[in-house]
C-alpha cells in the first residue's frame, strides 16, 4: 500500500518535482530546491531506526547526514566516527548528487519519505514488490500525481 501527500512550495523557492515511481504508479510532488528530504526505515538486520537526510538539487539528491539509533550501525557501515546528538548517532558527509534513489522495502517493513511537513510511506506490496524509485525533474504544467 502506498500513501502520498502533496507539498506546496514556499514563495520564492525554486520548485522542482519529486517523482515517485512504482511498477504500477507514477506521481509528481512539488518540492523546493535546497529542501531537505529524509528516508526513514528500520535496519534490515538489527531493526533499529536509520535516517538518511538529503538536500534536493535540480538534478537529484545530495546526502548530508546519516542518523542511526544505535552505535553498532555506525560500525556496521564502516564509518570512522559519529557524534551522539539527541539520542541518535550522526555521521555527516557530503556526497555527490545522486540522480536516483531506488527504494527496496522488505515484507513487514516500510520506508517513510519525509519532506517539509509531508510524509510518503512506501510499504511492501505484491503489486510492486516493495520497489520504488525517487527522482527529481522539472515539473510538468500540472504537478499533481
Give the location of each predicted region:
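Bacterial N-terminal signal peptides
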Residues: 1-8
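Sequence contexts marking disulfide-bonded cysteines in secreted/extracellular proteins
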Residues: 6, 16-18, 138-140
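Mature, soluble, non-transmembrane domains
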Residues: 71-145
Amino acid at each position: 500500500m502506498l500513501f502520498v501527500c502533496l507539498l506546496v512550495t514556499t514563495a520564492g523557492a525554486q520548485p522542482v518535482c519529486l517523482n515517485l515511481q512504482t511498477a504500477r504508479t507514477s506521481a509528481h510532488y512539488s518540492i523546493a530546491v535546497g529542501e531537505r528530504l529524509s528516508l526513514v526505515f528500520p535496519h534490515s538486520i538489527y531493526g533499529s531506526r536509520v535516517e538518511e537526510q538529503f538536500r534536493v538539487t535540480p538534478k537529484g539528491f545530495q546526502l548530508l547526514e546519516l542518523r542511526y539509533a544505535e552505535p553498532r550501525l555506525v560500525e556496521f557501515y564502516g564509518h570512522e566516527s559519529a557524534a551522539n546528538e539527541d539520542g541518535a548517532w550522526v555521521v555527516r558527509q557530503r556526497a555527490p548528487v545522486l540522480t536516483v534513489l531506488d527504494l527496496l522495502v522488505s515484507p513487514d517493513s516500510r520506508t517513510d519519505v519525509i519532506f517539509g511537513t509531508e510524509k510518503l510511506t512506501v510499504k511492501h506490496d505484491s503489486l510492486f514488490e516493495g520497489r520504488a524509485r525517487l527522482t527529481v525533474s522539472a515539473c510538468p504544467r500540472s504537478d499533481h500525481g
